């Protein structure tokens, strides 16, 4: 069996390992256009901020490891064409310019995503940068050495983490976002209010509800100003963090896709062509809160889907369980966890919900110290089905987001969570765990 894997970051690396573990006889050929694999882009802000000293530590695999497992790994090869009728892949060696065409029995599309680049006048100016891969991380580090004024465009996780990194390294930082709140997809207003105040207190200039209209360059062609409808900001460097779109042009009109280009897959990672599989940022996910297809480019989704490709390559063995989009964030000492829909995003997902916000100490007051936990539970009206939750504290409560994630995945109700069994030990929690208390508060509000 000949297997061709196109793209090798998180989903691709996971898929190759799973394919060879489950099908050691398979002839696996991997094409990757970059000179590295498995880069954890979520660590770029840690690298920029000096928490991670060596960017090489942000790789968890390498071509040599995959080769040792039995794969033929072709780095710096760009796939230019996929012929789904003849079942062939044509790739170009970016070092020599030579092209080659190979046949496949099974094709795995793990081509990932690429940052969205809005068509803003002046966006081609020097020092307007993207933040996705290893080479871009190194460019940001190098450019930041001389930059005093940094503008970050986009208030999602990557943008916010970069803001923190630049503040910690002494830069003057402006955050521009078209929405009126930061982290709008992940947190509701009670949480973002706290975090926005934290940013302002740290000297960050927040320009929320503002879209960039133009970038202005100086005489050397370097970005100098960022202009919005009501303001303009001086800048030595701009980082664009406005989201991602799937890299799936190679299969356009050849398999079913969402309007944004994300490849539709079934629960076994098969596309509309049963011999073509897709996983990671190039593919859709099944979003459990709304029971719909969605596009959520997260490394956690990628590694799970990649593993499933290997399990289901020749027969349908292990079904995808879907995702809640569970995520965590560390920002200026705050530990934050989120899963499922927010109250605000629920409407966009076709859900009619209520939400309860509750705050309590994570452990008894008789202990020498404790910390407040701010929580929210989002649940369907009528059914009480839990569809989302958020937590934030100076204490690390982020693993509780995983607990809420399981509650969403398993369609638990508010009543279920209110009386669920959790341990009690005064070092760690109270006789009623704070998640119990959150759900009990929700019951009181019904």
Swiss-Prot record:
GO molecular-function term, one example from the UniProt record: NADH dehydrogenase (ubiquinone) activity
Modified residues (Cysteine sulfinic acid (-SO2H)): 42
Entries under Pfam families matching the protein: Pyr_redox_2, Pyr_redox_dim
Residues at which NAD(+) binds: 150-165, 177, 186, 243, 328
Xref: Gene3D superfamilies: 3.30.390.30, FAD/NAD(P)-binding domain
Cofactor binding note from Swiss-Prot or TrEMBL: Binds 1 FAD per subunit.
InterPro entries found in the cross-reference section: FAD-bd_OxRdtase, FAD/NAD-bd_sf, FAD/NAD-binding_dom, FAD/NAD-linked_Rdtase_dimer_sf, Pyr_nucl-diS_OxRdtase_dimer
Cofactor(s) it depends on: FAD
Keywords of this entry: FAD, Flavoprotein, NAD, Oxidation, Oxidoreductase, Redox-active center
SUPFAM superfamilies hit by this protein: FAD/NAD(P)-binding domain, FAD/NAD-linked reductases, dimerisation (C-terminal) domain
Subunit comment: Homodimer.
Family: Belongs to the class-III pyridine nucleotide-disulfide oxidoreductase family.
Protein name per UniProt: NADH oxidase
Organism: Enterococcus faecalis (strain ATCC 700802 / V583)
């Amino acid at each position: 069996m000949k297997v061709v894997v196109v793209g090798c970051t998180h989903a691709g690396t996971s898929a190759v390992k799973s394919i060879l573990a489950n099908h050691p006889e398979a002839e696996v050929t991997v094409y990757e256009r970059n000179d590295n694999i498995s880069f954890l882009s979520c660590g770029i802000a840690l690298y920029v901020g000096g928490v991670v000293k060596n960017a090489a530590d942000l790789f968890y695999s390498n071509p040599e490891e995959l080769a040792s497992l039995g794969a033929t790994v072709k780095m710096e090869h760009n796939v230019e064409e996929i012929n789904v009728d003849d079942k062939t892949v044509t790739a170009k060696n970016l070092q020599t310019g030579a092209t080659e065409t190979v046949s496949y029995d099974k094709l795995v599309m793990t081509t990932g995503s690429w940052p969205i680049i809005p068509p803003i006048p002046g966006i081609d100016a020097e020092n307007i940068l993207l933040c996705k891969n290893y080479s871009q991380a190194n460019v940001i580090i190098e450019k930041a050495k001389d930059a005093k004024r940094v503008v970050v465009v986009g208030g999602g996780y990557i943008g916010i983490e970069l803001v923190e990194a630049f503040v910690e390294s002494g830069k003057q930082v402006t955050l521009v976002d078209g929405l009126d709140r930061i982290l709008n997809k992940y947190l509701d207003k009670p949480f973002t209010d706290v975090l926005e105040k934290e940013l302002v207190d740290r000297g960050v200039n927040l320009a929320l509800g503002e879209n960039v209209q133009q970038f202005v360059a100086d005489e050397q062609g370097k970005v100098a100003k960022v202009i919005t409808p009501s303001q303009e900001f001086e800048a030595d460097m701009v980082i664009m963090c406005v989201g991602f779109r799937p890299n799936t042009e190679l299969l356009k009109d050849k398999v079913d896709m969402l309007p944004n280009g994300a490849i539709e897959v079934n629960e076994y990672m098969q596309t509309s062509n049963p011999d073509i599989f897709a996983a990671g940022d190039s593919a859709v996910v099944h979003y459990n809160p709304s029971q719909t297809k969605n596009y959520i480019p997260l490394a956690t989704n990628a590694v799970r889907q990649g593993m499933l490709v290997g399990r289901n390559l020749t027969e349908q063995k292990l079904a995808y369980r879907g995702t809640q989009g569970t995520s965590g964030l560390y920002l200026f000492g705050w530990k934050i966890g989120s899963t499922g829909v927010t109250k605000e995003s629920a409407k966009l997902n076709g859900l009619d919900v209520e939400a309860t916000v509750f705050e309590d100490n994570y452990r008894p007051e008789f202990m020498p110290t404790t910390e407040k936990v701010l929580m929210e539970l989002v649940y369907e009206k009528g059914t009480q089905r839990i569809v989302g939750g958020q937590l934030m504290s100076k204490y690390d409560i982020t693993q509780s987001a995983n607990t809420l994630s399981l509650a969403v995945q398993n369609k638990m109700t508010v009543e279920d969570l209110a009386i669920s069994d959790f341990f009690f030990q005064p070092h760690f929690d109270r006789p009623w765990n704070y998640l119990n208390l959150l759900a009990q508060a929700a019951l009181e509000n019904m």
